[in-house]
A protein has these predicted regions:
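RecA-like P-loop NTPase motor core of helicase/translocase proteins
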Residues: 1-217
Length: 217
């Protein structure tokens, strides 16, 4: 049959040579277990930031399949001398911050765009179907300085891109459910949420065990 016909017969849709569209590079490397996939991912962050994104201080979201792996990866990326950390410090020196979701609001607004920021999280944290993990998409007053800083920089033009994203704006239903009354003045405006803040920075995304991750979205 050939690979194209065999693919179509197996999955019921045409084979696409550009898996993620014409504007997204797609390279597949087969690496055995223990072959150094994670250290390659660490080296990929500065390479992609420069060659593809053309930025000197990227934001990278590093997603892992479990909390145990999140803790291991976080420790490695934060430990001086560890190969994962060394791959990043070689490129960024001390202008580097590695953090978890709960620490994002503690990074000062001016640091975004000046230091490389690597956010380590579980894939489950961004699954919108899981009500217990929806803090990523919730309105958070702790991000007020960040969104007000973005608003002040260009009169809010930068925030306009969020209007095209799903689940990014405060709705009338959100305001009705809000017992504090804070959201009444934000209906139709972007949520002060972690998901929106990350979207503004168009992060690189590293997905550990991506071959075991799938979505209907």
């Amino acid at each position: 049959q050939g690979p194209v016909q065999a693919f179509g017969a197996l999955v019921g849709r045409p084979y696409r040579a550009d898996a993620f569209g014409p504007d997204v590079p797609c390279v597949c490397l087969r690496i055995p277990t223990g072959g150094g996939k994670t250290v390659m991912a660490a080296h990929a962050v500065p390479l992609l930031a420069r060659a593809w994104c053309n930025v000197d201080a990227p934001v990278a979201v590093w997603l892992v399949p479990s909390d145990a792996i999140r803790q291991q990866t976080l420790k490695a990326l934060q430990t001086p001398g560890h190969p994962y950390r060394a791959a990043l410090t070689t490129a960024y020196g001390e202008a580097l911050q590695v953090c978890v979701l709960d620490e994002v609001a503690q990074i000062a607004p001016p640091d975004w765009g000046r230091t490389a920021i690597v956010l380590v999280a579980t894939i489950q944290s961004f699954r919108i179907e899981d009500a217990g993990q929806r803090n990523v998409y919730s309105f958070s007053e702790s991000l007020e300085p960040h969104f007000k800083s973005a608003q002040a920089q260009d009169g809010g033009r930068r925030l306009q891109c969020l209007h095209a994203l799903p689940d990014a704006l405060v709705t009338a239903e959100d305001a009705a459910r809000d017992r504090t009354g804070v959201l009444q003045g934000f209906v139709g405006q972007p949520r002060w949420s972690l998901a929106n803040w990350l979207a503004l920075h168009r992060p690189l995304v590293i997905v550990d065990e991506a071959h075991n991750t799938k979505t209907d979205k």
